């Protein structure tokens, strides 16, 4: 007789946004590792950029797009009814998928830390996960560790977030090395939370450091700002800096703007770069990690993915955080800590112009980064932790409620 195999449990992974490729790349790496133990379905809040692919064994479901940034909760008041209808539609998709999958684990990115606006769609899902109809699912919150400036939050916001975590979540996973950043530095409710919090390390690419992009010439300065939605000031300053530096030395520079740089800014940048043989401007590259590996120096806003790559490769890096309110705090904190650990230099956004950037790049060319020893196995560690926690929850439930015919999905 053939040996009977146990059906693998389902896992629902709710990704906060499909718009930002850096967030998606982290989601992909964690989902890839979770798929070793679970049948993983990722629920996406927005469409996936064309150049990003999920593993074949990870299913994806697209929610109706709200057309707003959940980080800022900014929306046109005239769209209030439309947004209410969209939230109901998204909630219905989440519930439908939950009923279909009967997941053993529900993992949710960033709620309730950054996504109070999405409470109406997320809470009904969590309540179903906890009501025991299909067994008490493990509910996991996930965040990258450096939150918005907690000083700008009032006590009620922080306390409400902590209450939601204690009421609905079994555990919180922080995708950071605790030596680098701990969540309690940025999130300080009045009462101590009861939900367990685990810092699992930074999430890096499964294959480690990517091979160098062969299209990038030696001794190149690579300028990037994630998807580019707030990269315009950095890119314009980079063009001016290249012109200033070009008067005394030959310095190849490649600017990768990202898909979300507004079209008018893109066209203006291309026009300004025209006629400079050592300056190239591109919307995207096949693999930003490969481009960073090939570059001699990196100038970036210190997004999560760029910071992790700096830790991996020790590429001399200049960090110029975004002036955008939503991104600035996390990028500045991340950059300051990398500078402290000897990874690079920092130019604050209020000091950014062509001359200051040229001076910092010139200093960067003489900079020698130090080796760092942070945990970069965040995807593996998180997947192992979730797998063990789900198993423990199963065993605890079996002991508390023994039954000859366990109806829970396996």
Regions found by a protein language model. Give the residues of each.
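Donor-nucleotide binding loops and adjacent catalytic segments primarily
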Residues: 31, 187-188, 202-297, 332, ...
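Conserved nucleotide-sugar phosphate-binding/catalytic loop shared by glycosyltransferases and other
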Residues: 7-15, 33-85, 89-91, 96, ...
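A short, glycine/small-residue-rich beta-strand->loop->alpha-helix junction that serves as a flexible
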Residues: 14-28, 231-233
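C-terminal amphipathic helix plus adjacent low-complexity
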Residues: 359-410
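A donor-sugar binding/catalytic signature common to diverse glycosyltransferases
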Residues: 46, 287-333
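Nucleotide-sugar donor-binding patch of glycosyltransferase catalytic domains
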Residues: 312-363
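Conserved nucleotide-sugar donor-interacting segment of glycosyltransferase catalytic cores
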Residues: 95-166
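A nucleotide-sugar donor-handling region in carbohydrate enzymes
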Residues: 143-232, 258-263
